Amino acid sequence: MRSLFFIIAFITTSSFAQVINEICPSNIEVHEDFFAGFLDWLEVYNPTDDAINLEGYALSDDYSNPSKWPFPPINLSSYAYLTITAKDDPILISTISFLFPRRGGTVYMFSPTAELVDSIAYPEIQPNHSYGLIDSNYYYFEAPSPGDPNNSETGYKGYANSPSINLGSGAFEVGTEIVMTAVLPSETIYYSYNGMNPGEEEFYDSPISLDQTRSIRAIAQADSMINSPSVYRTYFVNANHDLPIVNIGVDSLDLFDNETGIYMMGPDAVATPPHLGANFWEDKEVHVFYEYFNTDFELEDAMNCHIEIFGGIGSRWRAMKSIQLRGKKTYDQTYFSHNYFEEKELDEFRRLVLRNGGNDFCNSCMKDAALHNYFIESGLNVDLLAYNPVVVYINGHYWGIQNMREKADRYYVESNYNLDPDEVNLLGQATLDEIDGEATEFIALTDYANGNDLAIDLHYNWVDDQLDINSFVDYFLIQLYVNNRDWPNFNLKVWNAVGHEKWRYLLYDMDVGLKYNGTGLPEQQSLAFILNNAVSSNPHVQILEALLANEGFRRYFINRYCDLLNTAFDAQAIYASISDQKEKIESEMGMHYPKWCGSIASWHERFIGQKGFIDGRELIIHHELAEVFELPQAVDLTIDVFPAGAATVQLNSLALDEFPFAGSYFNTNVIDLTAEIKLGELFKYWENRRTKERLFELQIQVDPEDQDEWVVVCHSNEIAEIDIVPNPAENEITVSFSLTSQSPVEISVVDLQGKDVMSTSYPEFFLRGRHKINMDLSQLLAGHYILFLTTSYGREASQIIKL
């Protein structure tokens, strides 16, 4: 209880008094800041007859830091209320610069002389509730009153206790009994099956016998108390799935109310697709309880979060909607905490998407997802969105398969790069929409590329300092390969951040790829398409055109495309991966496809067209590259190593370790070859078996001709293990060794600091067989040494000790 002495003392020293009257540490939809939306807030009340100038006063959550947030010049009228929002990184000086933890905390108010004026120690508060004063007593408020007096009729003593339930979420047999227990005899339990806040008609008075899959939401009520926080459970009965399962517990009216439900057309929808004006086009969030189960129905993640309908013109109007899952700071758990994607070692995500397939809905339903997974597995240098197909339930009712994906936003950068999401610049489309941060730096990059000749290395290097060029190339090549005609003017994002200043592209939405856009060959030539006048004003294409003026970049671009056509873009490899992904979800499509799309047979047919596109793509691209860059047609070459296993090879951007390697490249566009010799082997030369040409450098550049076969030729180390006696020795040792081929020999002795202290060469050839050499060590100081025996084929080492 607040002391009257405290108020009197403050009036005496400051000529007025004020009180921290109410606090809301988890504001979702109660009080909206005009500039920043729904933020935590605190209310100050002036209980005096005089107006107050708050300048010089301060708020803090740290008693030892009384000036943490100073009030700006604000006059608070007599008996008036001032509501102040809070944000950890505010833009306006009128916003408190720290947050209020929902689990409880203390906020202090200090005078200009750092004297404590007031404080409020608040307990854990549920979202949208507040805690404040009525007649010097603190109450909980289910209906906060920012800017107005607190109402004793709406004040509560606290919260009822959440009921306990005997069984956690999972799979159970028919007839299993669910028992709920109140913590106190004065508390009554209510529950619902449709995700709605339970009402009095759903009174719990006896165990529930499971007869079907159920999603239960339960609360407890008590006199003078706010209803307890909800408890959620999902019980699967006679369910069997080969994919992980997501259940979304949600007030069914929030989704399906004809007037207000976010899944529905609503009263203002245009009659024809994509039904602009429909409820599902609104950026409206609703609260849900999210649960994620593995295929054994074991609960692996669960949290309160928000959802909103997700996607563009090709997605939102579909019968099954894409849903964005949004972790919120207002709840106990802000991040989805599980390793959802096998392809990435990540286990924290602020946002996830349950995607319907977008433009691929009721086709393969997985095209974009399968391509992303494949390119991640292939190690391409692009920011890609991992994929995990899941079976979705809503309030315990089967809904269908959706593609769980990473969200292409600033929190993707946080999860994948461990960077501050508030320091990310994320731009969208050809128009460089500022999704987050600012476009200033990227506009400067575009202007520089357009205003300077990048054929000059000085200018090219400046762009290279601003742009991750290797990633830029891989990003463009993926889009060009799949022939994505919903790009590059749309479905494009690029980012940089403090700590990662080079711009990178974030790839998403290839739904319209892997199919023909017309009947003729030019319609499939995607590089020629983006370089023509149709997209000439696109800044991303302008950067590519500027870079292509540089001879080194142009050679890299062509060779990288060829490298990928020979590996990651290989038709057999891509379609094998798509087939694996198809097989992974096939057992579930028998329920999903008829529910939403029609005959399951038509689903299988969708993959025939994809295979036809993939099978013909390499030839089309080779033809296009030759045409665009005025090159001869591609030629076939082979890379090999002799003897087998003696070396690996770096071919342009490819690290080769399996031989022979066969690929296609362009004559007049030089390729790079580097031999990387394994330990115990000696490099002799590169040999072109077609021409018998030999090159004696490890790193070479060659102009490929048809049927070239470049081979790394090596010698194995043919020295048998050496034997030294006596060892330790005083003055003389005998070195015994065997050779499998004739060779000159050199013996050297090195001290432990690496200094050569003794060396003897034997230029005459030692024949194949066993040999002995006597050595005088009398000139050496006592100690430990390393003896090296070197031949034309290798080197062996052994430790010796001089007494």
Model segments located where?
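C-terminal tail/sorting-segment detector
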Residues: 773-774, 782-803
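Short, compositionally stereotyped local motifs that mark structural "simplifiers"
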Residues: 19, 74-78, 84, 125-295, ...
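Conserved beta-structured recognition patch
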Residues: 47, 95-148, 303-315, 586, ...
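Extracellular Ig-like/FN3 beta-sandwich strand-entry sites
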Residues: 104, 211-215, 668-670, 707, ...
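Intrinsically disordered, low-complexity Pro/Gly/Ser/Thr-rich segments with frequent PxxP/GP/PP motifs
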Residues: 66-92
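Surface-exposed, proline-anchored Ser/Thr-rich loop/turn motifs
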Residues: 716-739, 750-755, 782, 800-803
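A structural motif detector for short, solvent-exposed N-terminal "entry" segments of globular domains
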Residues: 7, 16-63, 99-103, 120-125, ...
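Middle-to-C-terminal accessory/interaction subdomains
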Residues: 147-155, 244-272, 277-283, 288-289, ...
